[in-house]
Amino acid sequence: SSFFNWWYFGICMGILTALLILNYIQDNLGWVLGFGLPCISMGFALGLLLLGTRIYRHQAPDDKCLSVRIAQVLVDALRNRLLCLFSPAGEVREPLLPRNAQFKFSDEKKAVIIVESHLSSPPLQVQAVDAASAMEEANGMVLLLPIWAACLIYAVVFAQPPTFFTKQGSTLERHIGEDFQIPPAALQGFISVTIVLFIPVYDRVLVPAGRRATGNPSGITMLQRIGIGMFLSVVSMAVAALVEMRRLRTARELGLVDAPGVALPMSLWWLVPQYVIFGVSEALTMVGLQEFFYDQVPDGLRSVGLALYMSIFGIGSLLSSFLISTIDRVTVGRGESWFSDNLNRAHLDYFYWLLAGFSVGGLVVYLYFAQSYLYKKT
């Protein structure tokens, strides 16, 4: 757990550097230098990676890939789904791992591998154990899917800060002092700053306190951490909707609705709460998901677990685009798009409230599956 905390801390430090330094360089000193510095940095990082190639540990895979074994077992299981497996003494064989009491498909003995009682030579006994083990591993992978699906709405919310939050900020007063103006994209730095400040506090203060209270080495379970982060994403969307309502009211009161190029006399600090809340949400949910999908898959499928984690945000981004395009098509037909080019005539507040509602629904579904999930025994 601590490893994933500090790993994500390092990523956010890099993001923060890019937002605070590179954005300023690109806006004020030119794009050549703005792209040249990241190129040099990546070359340096690649050199460090290559220097360590001789000391990296690499474990060769088994003769047969675990994913292939699982696929073969599933095919055989479906072929024999109506049959039961009995031991030579006539007793029903028990599952190897207790977690499958949660997985009814296996518990009902409808998905088993047939091993005839007279085929009791050691090679076949080993094959039977391997098949049963692979079935348990396949069941474990299937049990991850409801959690995966319930987190998709969080990924839709995750796609909004780099886009609409930034667009909101571009319409506000962003000057600090008389000469310095914060670039709109740099507002994302509030999320990274929050994560960089929160993770050390969480890892060094909150986790030990939680460990003493619960006895869990991580303070709270992985699913509890994810759930708290998802709840905070709901709060972040609600706060963003309230701030947007205030921004639109300011534009109407000052007669600036049709002057989108004029910065509203409303400070960018109004946006800080939604950024900070979302930053804490991201620190909890993102790290929790990484740890969960890495820890709960079979050892031979760790890369698949991380792929499942990444796919949440890939599919979530696609769902966000689909949702926005659908809403835009519907609202344009009614004469007033929620996503008008003139943000003073748009209704991002409605969109944020909609996402908050979807997030509540997603959180309820998540809690339903999370409370019954049985962790893999280590």
Region spans (language model):
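Hydrophobic transmembrane alpha-helices of multi-pass solute transporters/permeases
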Residues: 1-378
